[in-house]
Amino acid sequence: VYPGNGVLEGGKIPGYTQAIGIVVTCDPERMKDQKLVKDGGWNHAYVMGLENCGSNLNWGPYPFVDESVLPNMTLDNGAENNMNGYTETEAMLAERASKGDLGNYEAFNAINDYRTSNPVPSGLSGKRSPWFVPSVGQWFDVMANLCGQSPKTFRGYIGGGWIDESYGTEMWNKINDQLNKVDKPLTLIISNTGVFFVCSSEFREDLCWNVLWVKPQISLMTFNKQSGLSYRAVVRPFFAF
């Protein structure tokens, strides 16, 4: 976070080595996760962290389960407005811990481990949330606010999400113009051509929401919950304050 119009030093934000994230949105209309308000009053901004966690992450196990603690998010019921990554993460961590099978839910297990290795600093205790897996709506806002293209403008709109065959490179460059200021650009993981981010949100029993970025293609759409190994899936941790 770099408030104001300060001057860059060598193309970088002064003190950039201490940066921990980039604000995705501070629009009150998008700060809809009521559990964030209840747990800490963290309804000022959603922030994307500057590194990935995990690797080859499946969302959940096979046989597939329609998770009772999560809503099924479709385009018809407003997937783009689901800003509840924290609520969904907390619900899944609690549910899987109670069942003793969190290790079978690799994306959520990864964020749980990341919380342990990257805890909220003691000086910020109570002032920001723990890390969480972002929801479909929070990734929608990353694309709209940081990448310069709302998924609503994608030209391959389909029943399971949004896809565009050529916006990917332009959007990748735009967000990295900002992340390069703190020397933390997005990096390509899939055969040096793309990256696959897991969302917290479920679509139905066998499908979850994901971001697939294989330049020049970009998509925010549903994939099989067991797609992790095929796409070398990772989580991009978020927090709120």
Where are these regions (language model features)?
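Short, compositionally biased
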Residues: 1-127, 224-241
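Short hydrophobic beta-strand that contains or immediately precedes a catalytic carboxylate
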Residues: 48, 133-134
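C-terminal, surface-exposed recognition/capping segments
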Residues: 136-241
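Loop/turn elements at helix/coil->beta-strand transitions in domains of secreted/extracellular proteins
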Residues: 43, 127-131, 137, 193-194
